[in-house]
Amino acid sequence: MIESVHFKYFRALRDVSMTLTPLTVLVGPNSSGKTSVLAGLNPRFSVSSRVASHNVPIIPPSDYWKQNPTDEFGIQWQYGGNRSGRLSRRPGFTIGHKTQPLTLDLQELRSENVLAYANSLSPTGGNLTNVFSTLTRQQQASVANELCRLVPMFSDVDLIPTQSGKHQLRFQDRWNADLWLTPSQVSDGTMLILAFLVLQYQPDPADLITIEEPERALHPYLLDELIQLIRKMTTGEIGKKPVQFVLATHSAELLEYVRPEEVRFLTRAPEDGSVQVNEAPTGSTNWQQVYKEYRESLGSIWLSGNVGGVPGR
């Protein structure tokens, strides 16, 4: 597990250190630096993987603070067991974790797929059909049963060939067994929940999964269920091994289902626009009093602006 990370002159992160928990939630307004943090947690995705001589990474100017490649760029990760990894312009960089970045696209999730083996969900979710197809029959049945529990308008999920020679998902209507709906006929939330449910069955899971705006199109009840699913994956209760998660959100509702110590509030410094990361001061008496006054509503505390991460406050 990544216990902490330090960013130096990386995108919007001029000099930022932050600790991570098994589940960490980044919250803040638009352009507050959440995407920069997620990119820095997945250097193979955000920074050119091409390597020059002497094992030195080629870092594009767009990845530097203010796009100034003369700055001393660097990212350092601290893992459990006193292990560490780093990425910089110096020779001999090391990366000790594998990241699966997810920015799920609703149109991509609905796409037909050319039949192929797919053991992990792609960043946009465009291979969801193939990922579901690759699952064992028992795993498919488990995913279908869980989806139908969470979205009780359906009684099954299946695959069907299309006229184009591809295949696509289909959803059986709960009240009419002869009626099967295509992905274009079901809700956005249905497609997103299905994508989240298949993550637990990836045979070679990443060490870290990052998700941008997981709350989109989900009923508050489903947000609670999603966080419970993620917690089970972080402990290894489900899945091949424990997986760490970092979520980026604008949702006060989602904050109601996580713990204060799991949240990082992001803001921009008014002087130079650099990102600032604050943790909830859970150990202070004042915080505990405020938390009680807000009836332990983390979303309400965030919207009040008292802990940062709100535009103009």
Where are these regions (language model features)?
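Switch/communication elements of ASCE P-loop NTPase nucleotide-binding domains
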Residues: 1-45, 168-170, 174-312
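Phosphate-coordinating catalytic segments in nucleotide- and nucleic-acid-processing enzymes
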Residues: 45-204, 297-300, 313
